[in-house]
Structure formats: C-alpha cells, structure tokens
Amino acid sequence: MAHTKLRIVLVEDSAIIRARLSESLTEIPNLEIVGQAETELEAVALLRGDNWDAAILDLQLRKGTGLGVLKALPQAQRIPHRTLIVFTNYAFPQYKERSMALGADYFFDKSREFHRVREVLSALAAEVPSASG
C-alpha cells in the first residue's frame, strides 16, 4: 500500500447514522473517510474505484440495497486488502448468509454491535504503514 491511512467508504442512507459513524471513526489514528453514498448506484460507482480499503455497507439504502451493491462488485475487485462490512438493522440470518456469500467480510447489527465496526477498523488501521516508516 502506498498510502498511509486506511481509506473508508460509508454507504448509509441515514444522515444521523452517517454522522455518528463519521464522528466515531475520525477518532481512529491512520483512518480517513474518502467517500459516502446513500444509494446503490452511488455506492457501486465509489466501490468500483481503487481509492478505498474498507467499506461500511447498509443493506437498506435510499434507492436500492446493499445486497445489490455486493452483487455489482466484480469478484476480481475483492482483493485481500479490501474489507467489506455490512452494518444493518436487518440482522436476520438469511441476510447474513447472503451477504457473506456475496463477499462481505463482516456482518454487524446496528442496534447491538456498533462498537464492533470501530474495533475492526481500528485493527485494520493499525496495520497501515505510517508515513514515518
């Protein structure tokens, strides 16, 4: 990796949740939010680029779904250093199974596992080489 920060994309239709995530994540050293999307179309456009390392993906979006986003990403783009975190209020087993089958690395319930997103991203950010060496 040539960059010195873990680059995050937030895919969430709720402005309140986006703000809460942004506030929580910006406290993590070596992490920056490089993009945000509210719809499936916006998310796919961002995630087809190469300017991200991890994405937080809601299942229910303003237009479209997180499952649609996962389906639209080519398997070839799912390289090992990219992490997809599904973060949803719809944490049903069938959604988890489908999300993981489509390439999600993690699946968390917004109402009970908000802290887990931060834990995962903190660990990933700690692995990013710093600019000083």
What are these regions (language model features)?
Residues 1-7, 115-133:
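Non-catalytic signal-transmission and effector/linker regions of two-component phosphorelay proteins
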Residues 12:
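Conserved acidic carboxylate
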Residues 15-35:
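Two-component/phosphorelay signaling modules centered on CheY-like receiver
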Residues 36-54:
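Acidic, metal-coordinating helix/loop segments flanking the phosphotransfer/catalytic sites
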Residues 58-59:
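Active-site residues of response regulator receiver
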Residues 67-80:
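Short amphipathic alpha-helix used as the core "switch/output" element in two-component signaling
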Residues 68, 91-108, 112:
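Alpha4 helix (beta4-alpha4-beta5 surface) of REC/receiver domains from two-component response regulators
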